């Protein structure tokens, strides 16, 4: 493996390599070796051999700032592609003239010097004015970089029209050929937005688990049922473009899954519970090797606290990463919909909430001498993948057991009511 002292790319762009002494044992600034894929040998990355196409942004309005390939050697300046070069001398403060071809005419940068800060001082420049427009007026003082930077986009002036940056060739090519797309909000008119936000938000959790051409797509997100600004087909099209998978079969499959889950849960999600209904929720979710678990009491009739606000508060209190916010809110929405479904089907019949509150109160102080209320606190554990799967299996097993007990109690209550009605008929 061979190493070679290199300058970082920013040094070449900023003319930094000319400000160093050209001694044989120059100052080592940057050393890098990159392994190649096909060979075990190392390949030294030579940043000096940059692509001239990177500077195509400077070719604006017929101007050509890079038609001359400039080489700096032995403290002298030479242009290979320019018609002529006069007075190319050392950089100790001497003057030199460079003949350039700008806007189809010959323009001369004359009487150029380097000041104490090693910046080129331009005393006379014909062909460009202070705004970098074609003119014959002189310029008092400018740096060499300012000539090129004048045509670069000014990000501070882009807030009026975000598409102004597309006037620059390199950015426009990246926009067209790359993954950069316009924001989704620009594709929706204001009238559609007003109609979409007119109704109350009914959030339905959507889960994708798809196998397609050797790829596994797993994703979870929330869908506002009252938002008509985008259809499942449009969402599937944008979703596949983001994944670089433009398969019509995959788009149709994603759209059908979304519509199927919306159809199954729309009635339950839109159901309003008029009276207070307190339930105990055991919430679990995992992000990589971190397993989150919490046990709390939730009122299904209370709309002041949404799952999104609850998830944000939990993440802030525990100092978790923001990736936990959609995971916790998604899991809480799914749990609430399961509980509402049991309530609609008549399986949720309870006169007392098993919240371990003192004296049988609806909420309040809990008497827990052994555990000191540790079961009612959020906690995050670092577990292996097998341990997380084991926890999820145990949770599903406990939920099935509780459902069987609830069904048995409900059947026993209906049987007693039927016996009472039969006795009254006799």
From Swiss-Prot:
Primary role: Component of the chromatin structure-remodeling complex (RSC), which is involved in transcription regulation and nucleosome positioning. RSC is responsible for the transfer of a histone octamer from a nucleosome core particle to naked DNA. The reaction requires ATP and involves an activated RSC-nucleosome intermediate. Remodeling reaction also involves DNA translocation, DNA twist and conformational change.
First-listed, main subcellular location of the protein, grouped into a coarse class: nucleus
UniProt name for this protein: Chromatin structure-remodeling complex subunit SFH1
UniProt family annotation: Belongs to the SNF5 family.
Domain of life: Eukaryota
Entry keyword Protease: no
Modification(s) after translation: Phosphorylated in the G1 phase.
Pfam families: SNF5
Species this chain originates from: Saccharomyces cerevisiae (strain ATCC 204508 / S288c) (Baker's yeast)
Note: Present with 3940 molecules/cell in log phase SD medium.
Spans annotated as Interaction with STH1: 201-242
Molecular function per GO: nucleosome binding; transcription coregulator activity
Entry GO terms, CC: chromatin; nuclear chromosome; nucleus; RSC-type complex
UniProtKB keywords: Cell cycle, Chromatin regulator, Nucleus, Phosphoprotein, Transcription, Transcription regulation
Assembly and oligomerization: Interacts directly with STH1. Component of the two forms of the RSC complex composed of at least either RSC1 or RSC2, and ARP7, ARP9, LDB7, NPL6, RSC3, RSC30, RSC4, RSC58, RSC6, RSC8, RSC9, SFH1, STH1, HTL1 and probably RTT102. The complexes interact with histone and histone variant components of centromeric chromatin.
Gene name as annotated: SFH1
Residues modified to Phosphoserine: 78
Gene Ontology biological-process entries: chromatin remodeling; chromatin remodeling at centromere; chromosome segregation; double-strand break repair; G2/M transition of mitotic cell cycle; nucleosome disassembly; regulation of nuclear cell cycle DNA replication; regulation of transcription by RNA polymerase II
Signal peptide: none
